[in-house]
């Protein structure tokens, strides 16, 4: 057997190992609507917190946000200048700003303050950018990073003034610490395979939910390419999912193309919900999923 060490391939293989049963009797037309952080959206498929999309297409960050706004989904954004974030928000996209774990916490507080003043509905941090692959602290575009303590995360939570979310959680261990810090949500993610042999987010999701319950939103990131992928995450307990790299090639075609693909993913999700007897997101049931063992 030729086993890959690539987390992206491992994640894809895990998605493809999950099979669904159907439930037609007494089923009805489903609704994919969801409320997150006090705002209503058309579906639980969100855009992922990407950065530097101008390298993919001119004005890529704004195009990405405009696509999210047109599709009526929650938008996430990563690194970028204050001016870029303001342009993203000018599209009307309801946006979550994710901030790197800068070594100097004053940088973190400053970026949070600007994001909230500019109109972001939530902020957060991708904690997995703390270390490099050689065991030292990471550096992102020359900016020094550092691992954060639970107390530091609590300080960010208390200072934010809006919901604070931790991205890069891949264990019950970190999830429980996020709860202790008062986080308003977590993103289960291996950050596009930052570490070889990382467990697929969807694989560890049930263990995380067993540890922390459903008191806060638990989002799933990495490898989401279809409404079927989204359904599998939701059935196993995710609140919503993020699609990122799957949408990147569409940036050259414009916001309408991005919105159209997100809309298609929502329709794919609704199609699977209908065929498995799920009328609303609150009725998701993990017992519909079977693991391939052949």
Give names to the regions the model predicted:
Residues 36-80:
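Active-site cofactor/substrate anionic-group-binding motifs, chiefly glycine-
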Residues 1-8, 251-294:
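C-terminal extensions of enzymes
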Residues 69-105:
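A gly/proline- and charged-residue-enriched helix-loop-helix capping module
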Residues 1-41, 284, 290-294:
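An N-cap/entry alpha-helix motif that binds or orients negatively charged groups
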Residues 13-20, 73, 117-121, 158-161, ...:
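Generic secondary-structure signature for well-ordered alpha-helical cores
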Residues 66, 91, 103-220, 227-251, ...:
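Alpha/beta enzyme core
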Residues 51-53, 78-84, 128-129, 172:
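Short glycine-enriched loops at secondary-structure junctions
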Residues 27-38, 76-88, 111:
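Short, charged beta->alpha transition segments
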């Amino acid at each position: 057997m030729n086993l890959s060490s690539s987390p992206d391939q491992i994640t894809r293989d895990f998605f493809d190992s999950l099979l669904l049963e159907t439930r037609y009797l007494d089923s009805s037309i489903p609704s994919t609507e969801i409320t997150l952080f006090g705002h209503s959206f058309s579906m639980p498929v969100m855009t992922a917190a990407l950065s530097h999309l101008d390298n993919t297409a001119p004005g890529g960050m704004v195009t990405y946000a405009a696509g999210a706004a047109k599709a009526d989904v929650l938008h996430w954004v990563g690194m970028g200048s204050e001016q870029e974030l303001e342009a993203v928000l000018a599209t009307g996209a309801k946006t979550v700003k994710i901030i790197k774990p800068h070594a100097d916490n004053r940088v973190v507080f400053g970026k949070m303050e600007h994001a909230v003043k500019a109109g972001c509905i939530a902020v957060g941090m991708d904690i997995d950018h703390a270390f490099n692959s050689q065991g030292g602290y990471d550096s992102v575009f020359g900016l020094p990073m550092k691992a954060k303590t639970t107390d530091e995360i609590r300080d960010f939570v208390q200072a934010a003034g809006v919901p604070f979310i931790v991205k890069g959680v891949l264990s019950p261990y970190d999830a429980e610490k996020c709860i202790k810090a008062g986080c308003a949500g977590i993103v289960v993610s291996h950050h596009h395979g930052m570490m070889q042999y990382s467990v697929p987010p969807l694989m560890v999701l049930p263990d995380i939910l067993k540890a922390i319950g459903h008191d806060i939103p638990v989002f799933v990131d990495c490898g989401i390419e279809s409404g079927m992928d989204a359904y599998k995450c939701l059935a196993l307990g995710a609140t919503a999912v993020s699609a990122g790299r799957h949408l990147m090639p569409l940036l050259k075609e414009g916001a309408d193309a991005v919105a159209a693909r997100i809309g298609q993913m929502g329709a794919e999700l609704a199609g699977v919900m209908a065929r498995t007897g799920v009328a609303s997101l609150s009725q998701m049931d993990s017992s519909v999923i079977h693991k391939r063992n052949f």
